[in-house]
Amino acid sequence: MTTLATRNTIMRLAVASACSWIAVSAAHAQQAAAAADAQAQSQADSTQAAPAAATEPEAKVDNVVTVSGSRISARGFTQPTPTTVLSSEDLAKTAKPNLFNAIAELPALQGSTGRTTSTNSTSSGIQGLSSLSLRGLGPIRTLTLLDGQRVVGANVTGVTDVSQFPQLLVKRVDVVTGGASASYGSDAIGGVVNFVTDKKFEGFKFNVEGGQTTYHDDKNGTLQAAFGKAFMDDRLHVTGSVEYGREKGIESPGFGEVGPNGRTWYKNPAYQVRPLSATTDGKPQYTVIEHAQQYQYAKYGLITNGPLQGTAFGLNGEPYKFNYGSNGVPTGTGAVTGCVNPFCIGGDLSGSVGAGTNLAMDLTRQVGYTRVGFDISPDHEIYFTANFGKVKSHFSPNPGAAKNANLTIQCSNPYLPASIAAACAANNITSFQYGTANAIFPENINVYPTREMRRAVVGANGRFPLLGKEWSYDAYVERGINFTDIIVKDMTLNARYNAAIDAVRLADGSIACRNEAARAAGCVPLNIIGNVPVSAAAWGYVAPENGPQQHTRQQQDVGSFNINGEAFESWAGPIAVATGAEWRRESYRVSGDPYGNGVWPDTPNTAQYPADPVLNSTVGNNWYAGNYHNASGTYNVREAYLELNVPVLKSATWGEANINLADRHTKYSTSGHVESWKLGGSWKTGIDGLRLRAVTSKDVRAPNLSELYAAAVVVNNIVQYQGNTVTIQQRTVGNTKLRPEIARNNIFGVVLDRPSWAPGFSASVDYFDIKLNGMISSLTAQQEVDLCVAGNQEICGAMSLNNPVTTNNYVTVQAFNLASLHSKGYDLEASYRMNLKDWNLPGRFTVRGLVTRNISFLTDAGVVGTIPSEGAGNNLGNTPRWKGLMSQSWDTDKYSLTLTQRWISSGKYSNEFIECQTNCPVSTVIHPTIYNNHMKGAFYWDLGGTWKVADKTTAFFKIDNIGNVDPVAAPQTNLSYGINPALYDVIGRVYRVGVRYNF
């Protein structure tokens, strides 16, 4: 199946590997010398019990080991790529309502998205998406599989939603913490997470659990049932599962400096940022503050400029003097003395919108799964699987729709109190600038994403004789479709809002909208002067019942064929081969509403979205947020691979060693041909229990549908070009000329696996080094212009800045292969297991620790005027210096207790900050100065236990975050919740109890 070039590549790699690599086998808890020990070790390697990063997934059949980090199945094979195994027992101990939460706690998992992330965004598209990210490289660079097969994406970036997977039938999860593109194809730069189901499950099992936080919110419940039965003398096997889960989330508390339901830790954190020009005084530019007050608006309205600046409005529009923090005094020019734009400290915080975001989304899971397998002969099975998964979520990104001093109110507005109208006349002004949190709105913005997956697989697997050996094969075809609907309620239309607040009194004494065209189209005036009720008619006009909508259909079609076996025996053992080919097609179509997308043949005006002269019907972008646009695209992939395992040493003195090689050739319909490869080895040394392993690989990620075919969005903008200010059309589109990202992964590890002098002890350390080039990233219009001026001809082709007709000047803003990343660090694990009967005590005791150390996470944007940015230890991001998971477990046949510790090291707000209090250097854009650059870490304790109340019934409990540790403040330049849910526990103490029934 491979070309001559491929074979030559393999041979060259084999020779090089034999000369220069000493490699490793297995992992944290390796294949045990005894089957019982192996099973016990695997069962102990859980997230809850700090699973071993080196633990290799294994399924033993006739001494053949299958591991997810490789396509090879062979006697005695130990792969060089570190792999963590979580068994079903391990996952059950975590007692999580969603397996995603258990896996995301692994230290190597960094940057995963769940229901506590992106709750402040309307348009990101990842809300409620449970996607896994290895090494902080993002979910798009982590390949998530179900039974070794790809799953249709739940987002236009192609990432899957683990919440749509069947979970009760999962017998193990394999986490491959190294590049695996040569074995599995695109996206496996960070590694692979493979969910393996129990295809031969017999019996029935049922799980029910419920819980809530210590604040009596985020109440959750889970119901799961699974069955399996063999028929026709065990030739026909049917398994299935149904699951329902609901996590009710944590509602928005609304406005003000208040946390939801008694959480007292929220203190309006923010950056107070002085102008660069002011930093010549030796003081820092940035200061982290609490009780930040946004002085450009108030809860019910604030005059922000002119002689009346500082006048706020309360109940029934009554004016009063606004209480600025920092003893601030308005200057009449928009500034406030004693404050640094846009924040004061303290004062009237009732209009703060930062705490108005949901801490956790309301999420509902409904999943159904079945597999029917039939043995057409003792060596051949055909099968069919069907998977239905529906995930619904709901959240509020922020209360109201704050307007930061960007409104103009006419002094003739009939809603103004007479005293303010008189003050306007006395000060000879006809209008003033105004800001409001819009707390009068009857509803917060509400976003309702729904993802529904339908997936079917038809396949066959079996064994056949070849070259005097037994070989195995598997083949399948798959179709997966994901429908995503995002419905937004209570969202305002900007143009209608502006028309409605610009009110006049007509000759008949009635109040109406000033804009006659808007008035003719149904404009209803809106009073935003003070705390006054909003009429249903006014609310229906500015925030119509049919808000922003996005409908997406993604489809994935796959055909795959793989064979593997032992080609022949060498003096050191069997030479194993795996080879195969795959064809895949990915496509999507997304459509928005006519107010967001613009009115076009595929999004016409309808009765739900009638024509309105006030709105921009061509470009769209009429909503306050949630302007979804139409797009579509497709690509296909053809690829073939070859993988070899070559034993090179078998000696009673020197031990055993093997070399693992893989090569994959892939052709994308969009970006052409690309090659990925892997060269690794493992050496079980002659030293008792000591193993070494190493692997180097070239891994790839092809551009996804969103990057290639992003919806076109056009807005007006200005750029600086050749000393002139140029007005442009900024056209944001996809880029079909993108190339695959290329990564080089290098791993070297040492494993001590239960030596005879310490049979219960295992430890490992693995060093990793990842270099990613041609990383796909987006630029601003100005950055593209600067790169063109610097001589980048590819980017020059994306703009026209010297057009004789100046209105035809444009810059196409799109993604390019410009950025690069270099990450390095190491994984540590140690575990000790002992039987307490040696101490005349009941049960077994296990201690484990798993830690990831990020030495560097350096990102280079590849943009003029920037420098590489160090992300390791940036605790506002995803990659802390240290992330750890430790556990201590006591197990008997009737009871178990597990104490777990989760640890995030302290870090910095940014590694580019220069920390100083006095005598600071002049701040720069690249290296700003800051008063305090320390961000605290966190340490959490969890406790869980089980009680076997009957032969088939087990009760369990779990307490997460026993100490109810508050989240660490994560300041931003704008008011937000000021937390980082990607690293920290933001929910608080959680209690869960449940019952499992098996027969």
Question: Which residues does each predicted region cover?
Answer:
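C-terminal beta-signal and adjacent terminal beta-strands/loops
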Residues: 4, 495, 771-773, 902-918, ...
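Surface-exposed, low-complexity loop segments enriched in small/polar and acidic residues
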Residues: 156, 257-263, 318-365, 369, ...
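Extracytoplasmic beta-strand/coil segments of soluble accessory domains associated
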Residues: 104-149
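N-terminal Sec signal peptide and the immediately downstream disordered periplasmic leader
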Residues: 2-107, 135, 224, 228, ...
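Short loop/turn motifs that connect adjacent beta-strands in outer-membrane beta-barrel proteins
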Residues: 200-203, 232-235, 376-379, 463-473, ...
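C-terminal beta-signal and terminal closure region of outer-membrane beta-barrel proteins
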Residues: 131, 611-612, 697, 714, ...
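Short acidic/polar hinge/loop motifs at secondary-structure boundaries
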Residues: 149-177
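N-terminal periplasmic accessory domains that precede
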Residues: 99-102, 130-133, 161-166, 187-208, ...
